[in-house]
Amino acid sequence: MNILIPMAGEGSRFKVCGYEHPKPLIEIDGKPMIQLAVETLGLEGKYIFVIREYDNKELTSRLENLLKSIKKDCIIVKTSTLTKGSTATCLLAKKYFNDNEKLIITNCDQLMHWDSKRFQNFIDDNSDLDGIAITYDSLNEKNSFVKLDNNGYASLFKEKERISDKALIGLHYWKQGKDFVSSAERMINQNNLSQNEYYIAPTYNYLIN
């Protein structure tokens, strides 16, 4: 299974709050945020990180060394420019997951309090599902949302638009990585932006349709 973590954004919300270091390196309880994100995710696989190549080369080197210490066999893809959103960032590494292998894309700034083995078992027991998104109940417009059909399957995904009370936590799964790539490329080719960015969740709509 490939596990992709994009982290090439500006981290503008953290900058506004006064943080000077790049978001992945901000410490929480003595550990960098990205280290806690990986540790609490608790899933085994081939880790792929897409990172920003900072003007400060020392920070870039520090982040690379940290990622290799967390997952020694990880793949690191660097970009010197800001992309048009997380989907565009993910596609910078597509040659590493544009295949039939399972793919998970998750955030670099979330700490998971969950049973990762239960999730892995759910994937294994439901191999007929092309994609899985984990939700929680929320009405906050800052989230991604999914609408369910009468059978409990996803029928529509929207970014920053509350179409239900089912918000996504920011962990996305595809049975085949190539399905994400084809959906993402279609979304970008159609210039289907959400809030002027290409987000991950709306790519699922291309599997539904």
Locate each region found by the language model.
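Conserved N-terminal catalytic core of the sugar/cofactor nucleotidyltransferase
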Residues: 2-5, 13-19, 26-27, 31-105
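Short glycine-enriched, charge-decorated loop/helix-capping segments at active-site entrances
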Residues: 19-24, 188-190
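Conserved beta-strand scaffold positions in the cores of enzyme catalytic domains, especially
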Residues: 25, 76, 131-132, 209
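A general structural signal for well-ordered alpha-helical segments in protein cores
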Residues: 60-63, 90, 154, 177-180, ...
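Short, conserved catalytic or adaptor-binding loops enriched in Gly and charged residues
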Residues: 66-71, 147-149, 206-209
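The conserved acidic donor/metal-binding loop of glycosyltransferases
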Residues: 107-111
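Conserved core of the sugar-phosphate nucleotidyltransferase
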Residues: 113-191
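Catalytic core and acceptor-binding pocket of nucleotide-sugar-dependent glycosyltransferases
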Residues: 192-209
